[in-house]
Amino acid sequence: MLTIALPTGRSLDNCVKILETAGLPVEKLKDAKRNLVIEEGVYKYLLAKPTDVPYIVEWGGASLGIVGNDVTEESNARLVHIADTGLGKCVMAIAAPEESLERYEIAGNAKNLAGLRVATKYVHLAERTFKELGIQIKILKLNGSIELAPVQGIADCIFDVVQTGATLKANGLAVVKETLDVSLHVVARESAVEINEPLFAKTVMAIKNSL
Ligand code: PRP
């Protein structure tokens, strides 16, 4: 049996599509209801919070995982990258209230932005990204509804994932800078890659060939 960790929420439909296209059984997975562990044929699927998928794979709870590279970049889990599925495309971006956009001419303006208050749930990725931009920031860690922070004036901007842009627009925010292309990636546990059991190898090959 091979265990694969999958993210709950808006990415799950794309994950089902990836597995189905690769020829893996997904009938029960499509009808998971509140079940967190679904066994189908020789596969066991685990349904986890997206941010937990990298750690579940790293700690050996699953041999494979599918998760956005926004999440793997934020985590410090040791994983082997298997493939970029190209599905679930979105971007990491800095966004700010529309009326404040003039402030953010990032190139050459880093000093003026020193002390910028950034709301995000991606603390590590934000630290790295703003460091690369040469901007010293203060981070307000939130766990969701990040857009609230600039709307309420408790942060100057947000650093978050943007898919359709609808949430930004609805809250009077606009993209200042896109910093990372994001999509769903297949990742594996290091030891699973080293051991490379037949079912693991066959599954990895099937997924790669179907992309
Ligand atoms: C994410 C993200 C944005 C939104 C972007 O939140 O944090 O709020 O999606 O998507 P859009 O560009 O299509 O509007 P999510 O829905 O995962 O919920 P959260 O606010 O609880 O993190």
Region locations from a protein language model:
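Domain-level signature for soluble enzymes in the chorismate/prephenate branch of the shikimate pathway
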Residues: 1-211
